[in-house]
C-alpha cells in the first residue's frame, strides 16, 4: 500500500495510524511528528524538506530506503536496527554516523551536513557515497577502503557528480597536495 501526500498542507498523521503502508511520500509538507508511523510495515519513506526533527517513530519499521533531505533531524539513533539499503541525509543537521555502524547500507548521501567523522562507516558494504570532503577531519581512510562503485559530492535534482572511486581519489589527492603547498 502506498500513500502520496507530497506538496499538501497535511500536518497531522494520526488518521493514518495503523495503516499497512509500505511506501509513504510526504515531501514538502508541514509534518513534524512521525509517531503515527510507529510499527507500520514501511519500506520506503520520502520526507524531503519537512520540518521533522525526531525520527524515533520509524525505529520499528522495516525501512530500506529513507530520504530526509533538508529536514532538521540531528539524531539518527532510530536507524540503528533498520534493514537500510539507501539513506539520504543531505542538508540535515546530522553530525554522528555511529548508528549506521554494522548496518548493510549500500548508498549514503551526507553532503552538506556537519558530519566530520567517517570512521563509523568502516566495514559497511557501501557502493555509493555522496559527502562533503572539506568537512571531514577523521576517517577519510575509511572512505577510501569502502567497496564503492560511485563516489561524489553532489547527487540531487539539480546536479550530480558521481564518478569512479579511482577518478574521485585521484582528484581529491591532487586537491589536497595543491592546498598544502
In which residue ranges do the predicted regions lie?
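Concave beta-strand-loop units of leucine-rich repeat
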Residues: 1-11, 15-95, 99-116, 120-180
